[in-house]
Amino acid sequence: MVHVSSFKNDHPLDKRREVAERIRSKYLDRIPVIVEKAPRSDAPDIDKKKYLVPADITVGKFVYEIRKHMTKVSAEKAIYLFVNNTIPPTAALISQIYERYKDEDGFLYITYSGENTFGSDL
């Protein structure tokens, strides 16, 4: 079953496209990204969904930035990003991921999930 973005449900295509085009024309070196938690994920929530990401940062650096916006994330919790149901390479540039996976509205949609990496609490 494919997860449909709540951002897409809340905003019509033409409005999303207009916003993305305005962002891309005003900030040439930035990528408009929507980040949402995967369904049934126990990862912490984030305080915002829309990000204006520098085109030249890596996926790994973006994970670090996402962690800073999470509420109560423990060091043991690994955060995974998914683009089009695939985990992108950590060293890939956001601009590369955008060019390959951007949506028809001009946004890059990223889903995140988490997992405890050092075992569970007993």
Swiss-Prot record:
Record keywords: Autophagy, Cytoplasmic vesicle, Lipoprotein, Membrane, Protein transport, Transport, Ubl conjugation pathway
Mode of membrane association: Lipid-anchor
Lipid attachment, kind Phosphatidylethanolamine amidated glycine: G119
GO cellular component: autophagosome; autophagosome membrane; cytoplasm; cytoplasmic vesicle; pathogen-containing vacuole
Induction annotation: By Legionella pneumophila infection.
Site residues (Cleavage), renumbered to this chain: G119, S120
A GO MF term: phosphatidylethanolamine binding
SUPFAM superfamilies: Ubiquitin-like (SSF54236)
UniProt propeptide residues: 120-122
Pfam family, one: ATG8
PTM notes: The C-terminal 3 residues of atg8 are removed by atg4 to expose Gly-119 at the C-terminus. This Gly-119 forms then a thioester bond with the 'Cys-563' of atg7 (E1-like activating enzyme) before being transferred to the 'Cys-288' of atg3 (the specific E2 conjugating enzyme), in order to be finally amidated with phosphatidylethanolamine. This lipid modification anchors atg8 to membranes and can be reversed by atg4, releasing soluble atg8.
GO BP terms, alphabetized: autophagosome assembly; autophagosome maturation; autophagosome organization; cellular response to nitrogen starvation; defense response to Gram-positive bacterium; DNA damage response; macroautophagy; mitophagy
Record's subcellular location: Cytoplasmic vesicle, Autophagosome membrane
Alphabetized Gene3D superfamilies for the sequence: Phosphatidylinositol 3-kinase Catalytic Subunit, Chain A, domain 1
Alphabetized PANTHER family for the sequence: MICROTUBULE-ASSOCIATED PROTEINS 1A/1B LIGHT CHAIN 3-RELATED
Family note: Belongs to the ATG8 family.
Functional description taken from the UniProt entry: Ubiquitin-like modifier involved in autophagosome formation. Participates in membrane fusion events that take place in the secretory pathway.
Protein name according to UniProt: Autophagy-related protein 8
Source organism of the structure: Dictyostelium discoideum
Source species taxonomy: Eukaryota, Amoebozoa, Evosea, Eumycetozoa, Dictyostelia
Gene: atg8
